[in-house]
Amino acid sequence: MTKESIPNELLNLLNEEEIIMFRELQIKIQELNYKTNLTRLIEGDDYWISQVYDSLWTFKENTNKNFDNKKFIDIGSGCGFPGFAYAITHPNSEIYLVDSSKKKTDSLKEIIKSIKFKNDIFVINDRIENIGRQSSFKNGFNIATARAVSNPSTVSEYILPMLKSNGLGILYCGKWTNEDNKNLEKTLNVLEGQILEIKSNFLPREKGMRNVIFIEPKASCPDIYPRSIGKAEKYPLKG
C-alpha cells in the first residue's frame, strides 16, 4: 500500500516508524484472517480510517490530556484495536488486551510475536467480569477502553472498577443521543463515576460519525461491581 493511500488526517498523526508498524500489523491481521475471522475492516480505508484513525484520533487530538507512560487495558480487544494502535503510538505504556474468545487471544499473541512492539503487552483470555473482581487488576489502570462492545451503560460497569482514582475510561460509540446520555449518567451515579467529556468527529472519506465518551471515577467504585457474568448486559444499572 502506498503512503498516498493513507489519509492526510492520519499521516499528520504518525511518524515514519509508526506507519511501517501499522503496515506490518495490517499484513499480519490479513494473514490471520484466513484462519480466524478477526475483522472485515482490513483493506484500504476500512483499515486506515475505520481501524487506525478511529482508534487514534481521541489520543492524538486531545493535547490537554497526558496519555504517555500509562497502564492501559482494552476490553473486548477483538483484532487488537484500539489496543495495538495505542501501543504503537505510546511505546512507554504497559498494555493489557482482554477478550473472552480464545481464538482471538491466540491471534493477538501471534501478532505480538510478529510485530516489534516496544511495550510490554499482555493478552488475557477471560471475561472482564472475572478480571474486574481480581485484586491484581481492580483499580489498577490509568486508561481503560472499550470499542464496539455492548452498550455504554453496560460497558461502564466493566470499565469503572478497573480504573485508578485518577484513571480515565474511554468508550467508543457511533451515534449518541440524549437518551444514551441520561442512561449513562444514571449508571455512572451507581458506580460512583461521572462523564468527563464527550467528543465527536466525522471520520475522513465519509466513514461516518464517531463519538467518544470519557468517563472517570468520582469516588471508589463499590466492590460488588462488576457483577457476575452476563448481568451487566442483561440488567443494565439504571440508578
From Swiss-Prot:
Superkingdom to which the source organism belongs: Bacteria
Pfam families documented for this protein: GidB
Gene Ontology molecular function: any one: rRNA (guanine-N7-)-methyltransferase activity
Record keyword tRNA-binding present: no
Enzyme Commission no: 2.1.1.-
UniProt-annotated location(s): Cytoplasm
Binding site for S-adenosyl-L-methionine: 76, 81, 99-101, 128-129, 147
Keyword vocabulary terms for this entry: Cytoplasm, Methyltransferase, rRNA processing, S-adenosyl-L-methionine, Transferase
Keyword Methyltransferase (UniProt): yes
Protein task: Specifically methylates the N7 position of a guanine in 16S rRNA.
Matching NCBIfam families: rsmG_gidB (TIGR00138)
Protein's recorded name: Ribosomal RNA small subunit methyltransferase G
Biological source species: Prochlorococcus marinus subsp. pastoris (strain CCMP1986 / NIES-2087 / MED4)
